[in-house]
Amino acid sequence: DFLYDDILIVDTEEEFFEEYGSWPLKRKDIAKMVTNLKRLGAEVIALDMIMDFPNGYGEDPILAEALQESGKTMVVSLLNLDTPIWYSLGETRLNGITDATEILNESTERGYTNVTEIGGQLSRIRFYPEIIKEHNIWPYAVQALAMYLDVEPSLEDGVLTLGDLSMPLDEYNFLWIDFPKLPGGLTFLKQTPAVITALEVLMDLEDLEDLDEEEFLEETEDLREMVEGKLVLVGDTSEMSHDIFETPVGEVYGIEIIADTVATMMKQQPIRPAPFAFEALVMLILLLAFFAVSQLKKFENLVFLLVIVVYSAINIYFYIYHGLVFSLSYPLVACFLSMITINLYLFMLERKQKTFIRGAFSQYLSPAVIDMIVKDPDKLKLGGERREMTAFFSDIQGFSTVSESLTPEELVQLLNEYLTSMCEIISSYNGTVDKFEGDAI
C-alpha cells in the first residue's frame, strides 16, 4: 500500500489550470504555493518542474526567496547523457547538467529526473555512481527522501543507504520500483487521498495569506492535517504536460512515479531481479518440462501452453509475494519459438513421410488405403500381420480365341473396359492390385 502518512502530492491538473486561466504556472505563484505549504507544516517541498530559463517577468528572485526561506526544498535538474544503445554495453558519459536558473539553483537542492525505459516501459531508476561522486547529484526521489529523513545518501558496493534504510541495486545500478496496489477501481494515484489539487494551496488560500500565523492555522486546520510533517511533491498531471509513462502496471504520471519510488525506498522493498542461480534453476526445469512434452504423441501443443501458463503464474507469485522478478519475456519468447520450431520440424517430417508413402504405394494401393496409411504410418509393420483376407483372381475365358477375332484397337478397348471394371470392384473393398498378366488381374 502507498504511504499516505508520509507523502503528499500537490497536483496542478486540468481543473486547476481551467480556474488559474493560463499555462504554465507563474513563478511568483509557485512562490506563493511554496510559502503556503511551509506555513501548513510541510517537511519537504519538492517541485517537479524544469525551470532552466529565466522568467520573463523577473519573478525568479521572488521564487528563490520563497525556496530559501522554506528550508527543505528542491527543484529538477536533467543530466545530458551520452548513453550506449544498451545500458550494459558501455559507460554512460555526462555531457553536462541542465539545472534551474542560477538564482534558483543557489537557493535550493536539486535532483535529476532522467528516466530509462526498457521494453517501452519505465520500471526502475538508474544511478550513475561516477556522476554522483563527481557532481553530488542524486536521483530526484533519493534526494527528496534524504532531505525528509535529514540524512546524506550514500552508494557503496551497489548498496544505497539513507540513514537506517538500505537497499541493494541490481548489477546495472538500477533500483526497481514497487508500484503500490491502488484501491479497487482506481487507475491513478491522483484519485487517492495521497493527492490534493493545487487549488487548495493557492487560490483557496488567497484571502488568508495576510492573516497572522495563529489565525492562519485556525482557518486551515483541515488542510494542515493533510500537509503537516509530510514530504510534499508538487507536479503537473495536466494533458499539456505530457508527463505520463508506460509502466508494468499501466500508465503512471511522472510525479506519481517519484512518489512510488520514495515509498519503495521507505519500505525498503524494491523489486529485485531473481538471483542468477535461481533463474538458471527455473530455466533448467522449464527446459526439462519442454523436453518431456515434446515426447508426447497427442496434445503436445496444449501441454506446451499449459507449461507456459504455469511458468507465468510462478513469476506473478514471486513478484507479488516476494518482490522477485524473473526474466519473463526472454524465456517466453524462447518457449514460443521452440514450440513453433518443433511444430515446423514435425510438420516437415510428416510431410516428407506422407510424400514417400504416396509415391511408394500409389501404383499398388487404392487411395482409401493410402489415406489410411498416411494417417497412421504405424500400420506399415515389417513382417506383416495375421488377418482374414480374400484373394481375388480374374481373367477372360477363351481370351486367345477372342483376341484373334478382334483388331488391335478393339482388343485394347476390351481390355481397358474389363480391367477397369475389375479394378473398381477391388477398390470398392479397399483391395490392393498386385499385378496384371495379360488379361488376368
Per-region residue spans from a language model:
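Substrate-access "cap/lid" subdomains that shape
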Residues: 156-217
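Structured core elements
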Residues: 9, 46, 176, 232-235, ...
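Feature representing long, continuous alpha-helical segments
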Residues: 257-260, 264, 286, 355, ...
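Non-transmembrane functional regions of envelope-associated proteins
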Residues: 1-170, 226-295
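Transmembrane alpha-helices and their extracellular/periplasmic helix-loop junctions
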Residues: 1, 264-368
